[in-house]
Amino acid sequence: MTETVGFGIVGAGLIAPFHLNAIRDSRGGDVIGIFDISRERAAQVAAKFGVRAFASLEEMLGDKRVQVVCVATPNHLHRDPVVQAARAGRHVLTEKPPAMSLAETDEMIEACTRAGVRFGCFVQCRVRKAVQAMKSAVESGRFGKLLHADAYMKWYRPQEYYTSDGWRSQRRSGSGVTVAQGFHYIDLLQYLAGEALSVEAGMTNIGHPGIALEDDVVARLRFRSGAEGVVQLSTALWPGTDVRIEINGANGTAVMVGETMHTWRFRDERPEDEEIRMLGNASQATGAGGAADIGYRDHMVVIQDMVDAIASGREVVIPVRSVRPTLEIVLALYQSAKQRKPVTLPITDDPTVWD
């Protein structure tokens, strides 16, 4: 029988059940336990899923069965558990964003590299079959010269979403739409279109009074590939519609809606194109109408990849170093909105954007 890979989860909030279910449904993954600074919350989740509630992170890391630590803490609290886990020789998977600054992200990458452990990130939209088809077409040059890479996320979150947990209404915790929801789709543009050269953004709050966060963003990106990008993000647009990702080149256009390939047209039609047009699964909820309206299947692919990477000795498919450029774009968007002018990349950290 193949040896299982034990997982420990740090953080017992809204996202923890996604990790628990994903690990349980994986081949070779096993949930050892969960830790949260709220012992009551950890105990509730542990009881529901029949796993151990650790009293501290140190206790979790002292359990030799835990080989991988999944960090599911609030956005601004990823650094410490990642570094501690790495120093204890554990592989790490962190929720997005890796951190709220480039400096902390680099510190975490360095800690994992020094410890010789794998360090992956849940930007799980990358693993969707429609996205992988787009990626393959970009890399093979099938689009020709890239002209546009656009993301439209028109979602809805009620006021209660932001008031349900203290950190969700705090700007410094990365609870605005750009980080909390939009990060995934900015990541897809970076993943598909490549390095960004400059950004320009406007951020406002149009639907959640009394919350000091942006819930609506319109931005323009310029990529080294020559492509232009338009990004529209909102959690104020009831009832919420599926995300739309569009890639346009001189020789073709691909559009993903939700996780389904909506448009796949190229000047050089190929036999496999009809099958690609059928990619996706409309049955998985994609989060448009509420935080709970999301499936965990994409999380499971990332979990399964870590299990397989450990077994085979290879790197994970989404190492955090590949997500750092996305964080840089996101931070540049905040800087642009604050300065009310375009920002050229690369950038340096500016903590005042969270004031």
Question: What are the roles of these predicted feature ranges?
Answer:
Residues 110-118, 132-147, 248-249, 253:
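Basic phosphate/pyrophosphate-binding loop/patch that engages nucleotide-derived ligands
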Residues 1-49:
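N-terminal Rossmann-like dinucleotide-binding module
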Residues 19, 49-111:
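Beta-loop-alpha module in the N-terminal Rossmann-like domain of NAD(P)-dependent dehydrogenases
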